[in-house]
């Protein structure tokens, strides 16, 4: 007995001690790969800062974005009093850009979220059941893909009317087929795997297989595409507002601000410069973040 205890203690002492921070979990592996993406980290920091600005925009602005007017500084450039200058009505551009982040980001995120939910469900159904389900859903997607996204959004807004809520609906509609095709492709591959056959053999329902086994396998692709799609949605929403179909004055949405700045572009270029830079940096940050997430979630894709 003593010999047995001695051998057991010797084996235990010989075994390497694994510290908690050395245990490899999917989350640790993701973070280890993602933090090597320096550009994506910077982009992620910018996106996080933008989200915080959007949440607290009303408290961060030095002036009221809609009801403050400095009639003595019309179209004045950047100064210590007005960091981004003043527009033709005397409104502080810095305050309007900050509040515009709240509106533009909300429009982009909500539109993509709606499109992702509906598109994911349709993609799961089309890929899993195939047959007439697949043909019907994919033909609808083909019809939607036949039109450029912005033209489809213009048509939807023309029917529903102008306003930021209708812009969200319009942008969401042309996001649906993109998510549906993505999820359908993943579903067609995953449903052939042995673990799906095992789930069927033990009597798992189609709903359980779809949402407990197949959907988790598509999450990484959805997250990456969701992130990159936000940039596209922000541009689309800003374009509609620029055309007068989205947010209406005096709402400080970035696209609407560009529309209002057209008349003073020559004498006061700063009025259009800062909203345009905000759109550019935001879209760039979401795209770079999406690239980094893709490389971290599926390193086989890189290269």
Swiss-Prot record:
Keywords: Cell inner membrane, Cell membrane, Membrane, Transmembrane, Transmembrane helix, Transport
An example molecular function term from Gene Ontology annotations: dipeptide transmembrane transporter activity
Predominant location category: membrane
Cellular location(s): Cell inner membrane
Membrane spanning stretches: 37-57, 105-125, 144-164, 165-185, 208-228, 230-250, 266-286
Cellular component GO terms, alphabetical: plasma membrane
Membrane-topology annotation of the record: Multi-pass membrane protein
Pfam families the UniProt entry points to: BPD_transp_1, OppC_N
Residues in ABC transmembrane type-1 domain copies: 101-290
InterPro entries membership: BP-dependent_transpt_permease, MetI-like, MetI-like_sf, OppC_N
Record text on subunit structure and interactions: The complex is composed of two ATP-binding proteins (GsiA), two transmembrane proteins (GsiC and GsiD) and a solute-binding protein (GsiB).
Function: Part of the ABC transporter complex GsiABCD involved in glutathione import. Probably responsible for the translocation of the substrate across the membrane.
Similarity comment: Belongs to the binding-protein-dependent transport system permease family.
PANTHER family: GLUTATHIONE TRANSPORT SYSTEM PERMEASE PROTEIN GSID, OLIGOPEPTIDE TRANSPORT SYSTEM PERMEASE PROTEIN APPC
Name of the protein: Glutathione transport system permease protein GsiD
Lineage: Bacteria, Pseudomonadati, Pseudomonadota, Gammaproteobacteria, Enterobacterales
